Every structure is written in structure tokens, then in C-alpha cells.
């Protein structure tokens, strides 16, 4: 079984580029419809590939797009307005304001750093040993604590949203980011690979640098869209 790598990459790039152009007001929201023929062509191509399990091939191809491209396609909507929600509406004065994205990644790094340092120093109780033997509950709570501290500083430095919102975002990032790590580890184990790619071998692959963001940013975006 071999997924369609090139069509998958094209679909993912198309989704991200369309999101950026829509969020910045260059093209209308209906431009997302361009994904329909792209996905249809992918399914048609599968007819001619003569794979033993075409369903598995298509499932892997489209899941890869859903897992990676969809979350990152939400970043432009957050960067071109205060929370991203306004970019979905007619907005004559759309501005580029990446504060949420900058703060988001700082919180991810704070959570990872806090979890690592606390886990190495005090980790005794395994979080989910069958998936990730090194993760501990002590590390998890250490990551949450450091992320909340950083969120407190971000509220004064970046602003964008108030202190309470930043702290809630920190908790979302810590919880969902941890699940993101575990899900990516689960997927790698299920396919029998150590690294998610040839880039950055020995460190889990390039995807390991973003697995926390894949799960947590859509939830942060949802929170800000509803309550920001």
C-alpha cells in the first residue's frame, strides 16, 4: 500500500495558500471550492495505480492532509485579524497581526521545556507508558505550570487578548499539545517507524517539532473564535 504522496502534498499546499489568500482578503471564501476538483482527481488517479488496497491508499492520503494541512491552514485566519473570526466576514481594513501565533508557539515551547525539565528531575508516574514510556504526570504538570507563567508575561508583552484568555490558551496548549505528542507517537508505532521523515533523523523527524501544534492550535482557534 502506497499513499499518493504528490497529490497529497499538492492538496495540502493548495489548502494553505487558499487560506492565506482568503484570510488576507485577496480572494473570496468560496475559493476553498478549488479543493473539490483536487481531491476528485486524487481519487480518479487511484483507479490507474493498480494498488491491492486502494481504500487504504486513499485513506492514508486524505488523513495525511487532514492531520497536517488543515490545522496549519487555520494560522492565516488568526494572523490577519485579532482572533481570526473577523477575517471570515467582509472586512475592509484587514491587518496583519501575528501576536496570537507568536504567543502560541512560545507557549508550546514553554510547555515542552517545563515538561522535560520536570519530568527528568521528578518524573515517577508514567503518563501513558504503552505509547510514550518517557512521559510522566510530573512532567505534564510542570509543563502546564511553566506555560501559565509564560502566558502571564505574554498578556503584558503581546496583549492581543486579556490575561485570562492567555492563561486559558496556555492550559489548552498544554493539554492538547500533550495529546498531540501522544497521537503522533501512536501513529509512528502503528506504522513501525521511529522517525516521521528523513529530515531531522534521530529526533523523531520534522513532524515531531509540530505535533503539539497540530492538535492544540485548532482548539485555540475555536476558543478565540467563540470567546475572543
Feature-to-residue mapping (PLM):
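Membrane-embedded alpha-helical bundles of polytopic integral membrane proteins
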Residues: 1-171
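A general structural signal for short secondary-structure boundary/capping elements
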Residues: 150-151, 219-221
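Acidic (Asp/Glu-rich) catalytic motifs at the cytosolic membrane interface
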Residues: 106-124, 128, 137-141, 175-217
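Juxtamembrane boundary at the C-terminal end of a transmembrane helix
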Residues: 221-228
Amino acid at each position: 500500500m502506497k499513499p499518493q504522496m504528490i497529490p497529497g502534498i499538492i492538496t495540502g499546499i493548495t489548502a494553505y495558500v487558499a487560506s492565506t489568500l482568503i484570510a488576507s482578503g485577496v480572494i473570496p471564501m468560496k475559493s476553498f471550492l478549488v479543493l473539490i476538483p483536487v481531491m476528485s482527481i486524487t481519487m480518479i488517479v487511484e483507479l490507474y495505480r493498480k494498488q491491492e488496497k486502494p481504500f487504504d491508499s486513499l485513506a492514508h492520503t486524505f488523513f495525511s492532509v487532514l492531520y497536517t494541512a488543515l490545522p496549519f491552514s487555520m494560522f492565516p485566519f488568526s494572523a490577519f485579524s485579532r482572533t481570526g473570526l473577523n477575517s471570515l466576514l467582509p472586512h475592509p481594513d484587514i491587518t496583519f497581526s501575528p501576536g496570537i501565533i507568536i504567543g502560541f508557539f512560545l507557549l508550546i515551547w514553554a510547555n515542552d521545556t517545563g515538561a522535560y525539565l520536570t519530568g527528568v528531575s521528578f518524573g515517577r508516574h508514567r503518563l501513558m507508558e504503552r505509547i510514550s514510556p518517557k512521559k510522566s504526570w510530573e512532567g505534564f504538570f510542570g509543563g502546564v505550570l511553566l506555560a501559565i507563567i509564560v502566558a502571564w508575561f505574554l498578556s503584558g508583552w503581546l496583549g492581543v487578548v486579556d490575561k485570562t484568555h492567555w492563561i486559558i490558551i496556555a492550559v489548552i496548549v498544554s493539554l492538547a499539545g500533550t495529546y498531540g505528542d501522544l497521537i503522533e507517537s501512536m501513529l509512528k508505532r502503528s506504522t513501525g517507524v521511529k522517525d516521521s521523515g528523513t529530515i531531522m533523523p534521530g529526533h523523531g523527524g520534522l513532524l515531531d517539532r509540530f505535533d503539539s501544534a497540530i492538535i492544540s492550535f485548532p482548539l485555540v482557534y475555536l476558543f478565540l473564535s467563540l470567546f475572543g
